[in-house]
Amino acid sequence: METNSHYFYVLSCRDGSLYAGYTNNIEKRLKTHNDGKGAKYTRARLPVKLHYAECFSTKREAMQAEYYFKKLSRKNKERYIEEKRREGVDYQPAKEF
């Protein structure tokens, strides 16, 4: 069963690196990462914080955004986030995790 919201998200890791992923529940996914049960990459770089997120109506769109983002250089990743924020795209959760 598909949910109505699909998210491409970017985490800031303790070492300053960025991690990009897909989820349909940002709050739960961020908790999973910080509990050390998320991606292997983030387990070694805890704690992580939500740096950026975009909401899409389909899983496919969110995963395409993630795929595109992962191919960018670090400089272009930051530029992508800055441009999207200027456009008002950045998803902000109701509470801090």
Curated annotation (Swiss-Prot):
Superkingdom classification of source: Bacteria
InterPro entries, per the entry: GIY-YIG_endonuc, GIY-YIG_endonuc_sf, UPF0213_domain
Annotated TM spans: none
GIY-YIG domain mapped to chain residues: 4-79
PANTHER family for the chain: UPF0213 PROTEIN YHBQ (PTHR34477:SF1)
Family: Belongs to the UPF0213 family.
Name of this protein: UPF0213 protein BLi00048/BL00536
Organism in which the protein naturally occurs: Bacillus licheniformis (strain ATCC 14580 / DSM 13 / JCM 2505 / CCUG 7422 / NBRC 12200 / NCIMB 9375 / NCTC 10341 / NRRL NRS-1264 / Gibson 46)
